[in-house]
Design a protein with these regions (language model features):
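Conserved donor nucleotide-binding strand/loop of the catalytic core
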Residues: 37-53, 61
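Active-site nucleotide-sugar/metal-binding loop of Leloir-type enzymes
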Residues: 56-70
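Short beta-strand-to-loop acidic/aromatic patch adjacent to the donor-nucleotide binding site
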Residues: 67-79
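Conserved donor NDP-sugar-binding/catalytic core segment of glycosyltransferases
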Residues: 83-129
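A recurrent flexible, glycine/aromatic-enriched loop bordering the glycosyltransferase active site
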Residues: 133-159, 208
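Donor nucleotide-sugar recognition loop
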Residues: 153-159, 168-185, 190-198, 212
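Terminal low-complexity segments of carbohydrate-biosynthetic enzymes
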Residues: 219-285
Length: 285
């Protein structure tokens, strides 16, 4: 984290062209960061309420700063070129619609030419799938596919830029995975676009599969389904649940199946469960 702060400070915050236009807010959900605030850098130590709690705390703090018009959400475990930030800044300054949002393309850090997602598409109002998944950016034929714009349902928080006045709701400060999905679900008015040269490199999600992530991933799918007004959403959720449990069981990943069953039960436990387990401390043990 400190290296990222220093890089952005050196290449952006201290440059005469940008130093009065940008602030860097670092919300730390873990151990305290030994880095002073000042010179456009604001370090905030926060209770660990997951990515959602951290990003929402940063959004609240950004709203307290005079003249802040736009915010970029960026994960601490990802990397991007400073040029991506500059391009996004220039684009949003010219955007006439306050609901215009820029989402960065995500590529794999261990295979940097392969795209994981360039925005995501809603399916059945709560399921989703990544657009341009596994597209090879080196191939000439990929250029035509990449330039084919589709209606994007939400953008990941590895790089997500928006007008602060376009936010109607804060995300729930729950310890969740896929909090960017829930945020997008609550802001369907956003006009989400992608830009060439705006991207972030992240670890492949397949390498992050774990019992806890399986628990959290199912909650991410379940919440939109439970609040959806779409007919048969609850039935589709049940079908999805049964399929995922069977797939995990038949591949002998019984601990993942148990985690999903536990997540399903907790999601149906009512409002009290969510209020009493905001940080999921007992679950994470």
């Amino acid at each position: 984290v400190t290296k990222t702060i220093n890089r952005i400070n050196k290449t952006l915050l201290t440059q005469s062209e940008f130093k009065d236009r940008f602030k860097l807010i670092v919300v730390n959900n873990g151990e305290a960061i030994n880095h002073p605030s000042g010179n456009g850098i604001i370090v905030i130590n926060n209770e660990n309420l997951g990515g959602s709690g951290g990003f929402m705390r940063g959004l609240i703090e950004a709203g307290k700063i005079n003249d802040v018009k736009h915010v970029i959400f960026m994960d601490d475990d990802g990397s991007c070129e400073i040029e991506s930030i500059c391009r996004t800044h220039a684009f949003l300054l010219m955007a006439k619609d306050k609901n215009t949002v820029v989402t960065g393309c995500m590529l794999f850090e261990d295979n940097p030419a392969i795209i994981h997602e360039s925005g995501a598409i809603w399916h059945r109002d709560f399921l989703h799938y990544p657009d341009k998944h596994y597209l090879d950016a080196r191939e000439i034929d990929s250029l035509d596919t990449f330039d084919n714009e589709r209606k994007i349902g939400y953008g990941g928080w590895w790089f997500f830029a928006f007008n602060i006045n376009a936010i109607e709701y804060y995300s729930f400060p729950f310890f969740v995975r896929g909090d960017d999905l829930l945020f997008g679900y609550m802001h369907k008015k956003h006009n989400i676009v992608t830009l060439n040269g705006v991207a972030s490199w992240q670890m492949d999600f397949e390498r992050k599969i774990s019992v806890l992530n399986s628990y959290l991933n199912f909650r991410t799918v379940a919440v939109p389904a439970l609040i959806s007004k779409r007919k048969f959403a609850a039935l589709l959720l049940s079908v999805f649940f049964v399929r995922e449990v069977f797939l995990a069981s038949f591949s002998c990943r019984y601990e993942l199946a148990r985690a999903m069953i536990m997540s399903y039960n907790d999601c149906l436990s009512g409002r009290e469960f969510w209020e009493d387990n905001v940080d999921l401390l007992e679950i994470r043990k």
